[in-house]
Design a protein with these regions (language model features):
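Juxtamembrane membrane-water interface segments immediately following transmembrane helices
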Residues: 242, 263-295
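Start-transfer (signal-anchor) and selected internal transmembrane alpha helices
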Residues: 1-24, 31-86
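Transmembrane-helix motifs of polytopic, lipid-linked glycan transferases
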Residues: 47, 142-163, 201
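Specific aromatic-rich, kink-prone transmembrane helix
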Residues: 110, 154, 196-214, 230, ...
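Membrane-interface alpha helices of multi-pass inner-membrane proteins
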Residues: 222-237, 248, 270-274
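Aromatic- and kink-enriched transmembrane "portal" helix at the membrane-lumen/periplasm boundary
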Residues: 27-35, 91, 120, 134-137, ...
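Extracytoplasmic catalytic/substrate-binding loops of multi-pass membrane glycan-assembly enzymes
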Residues: 93-105, 113-126, 134-138
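Transmembrane-helix signature of polytopic, membrane-embedded enzymes
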Residues: 10, 155-180, 197
Length: 295
């Protein structure tokens, strides 16, 4: 039985998805978002979203009331599939793509002079650390491929953990990684790819929280995991707060009664980590600020 509250949430979700698809469409067509075609596009996307959502509602996927044991064998399979699919693009674009943003960061790695024009945390984690093992852009891109595959492995295991059938997980994985745009973009070592990795981790953690009705969050070790992933996602892009901020807001809003102190702890730890990294840590490694930043 669908309650009035759920109907409003359903409508809100459809409106948000419609607006998202409408705005995204202009990134591909490079046309002006407020052109004469705007009403037609909105109506078209609205109909598409409504039909798709109603069709998906008819699919019954059983979610366990309690999580099952972790299936590491299945996780290894997901990891292997991800590595193979991404590996095809890695070989095709060897030694990996690089754009002007990444080239600037790679130059900072070689000189040891860091400027917060692009997120320094991304420069350090995804370029500097791998370069200490092998100072090669090809190796840096390979390590990034490993991180992507591990993140997808974690998400797949969480979905299986809560009763999603293996075939649905594999289908979702194949749909995500066989799209050429995904494979090509993930072949570039840049901040958008790094953000994607941590968004995948956050998505898995949100599944844990929602499916457990907040119980997953009621452990301080999980608070640390969620806060850390949120910090990393935010620091991969200068506008990362636009993603993490609303996520934490809704986390507190929906789970305040069931996990009040853990919600507060997550937000406070998140703030402390951000201040600590962008304050004392940046000063320690002499990060130079910039009057303008690239989001």
């Amino acid at each position: 039985m669908i309650t009035v509250e759920n109907k409003w949430l359903d409508l809100l979700g459809k409106c948000i998805l419609t607006l998202y698809l409408y705005l995204i469409s202009y990134f591909y067509t490079l046309s002006y978002p407020w052109s004469w075609s705007a009403p037609l596009r909105l109506i078209g996307f609205g109909i598409l979203v409504h039909v798709a959502c109603e069709a998906l509602k008819k699919i019954r996927i059983t979610i366990r009331s309690e999580a099952s044991k972790w299936s590491w064998r299945f996780g290894a399979a997901v990891f292997g599939i991800s590595m193979i699919l991404l590996g095809v693009y890695y070989v095709a674009f060897y030694p990996g793509g690089i754009i002007i943003d990444s080239f600037n960061q790679w130059y900072q790695v070689q000189t040891g002079v860091y400027v917060d024009w692009h997120p320094v945390v991304h420069t350090l984690l995804f370029m500097k650390l791998p370069s200490l093992i092998c100072n090669s852009l090809a190796f840096v891109n390979f390590v990034q491929m490993l991180w992507i595959s591990l993140a997808i492995m974690y998400l797949g295991m969480v979905m299986k953990h809560w009763g999603i059938r293996r075939k649905y997980v594999i289908i979702a994985l194949l749909l995500a990684l066989t799209v050429p745009a995904s494979g090509m973009v993930l072949s570039f070592c840049w901040k958008d790819t790094a953000l994607t990795i941590f968004v995948i981790v956050l998505a898995a953690q949100m599944i844990e929280i929602i499916c457990s009705d907040g119980e997953w969050l009621c452990k301080w070790s999980h608070v640390l995991e969620l806060a850390s992933a949120s910090v990393m996602a935010m620091l991969m892009r200068h506008n990362g707060i636009l993603l993490v901020g609303p996520m934490l807001f809704f986390l507190v809003l929906f789970f305040w009664k069931k996990a009040k102190k853990f919600c507060i702890g997550t937000v406070l730890l998140f703030m402390v980590l951000v201040v600590g990294i962008k304050g004392p840590f940046y000063r320690l490694i002499h990060v130079q600020s910039h009057s303008q930043v690239s989001a």
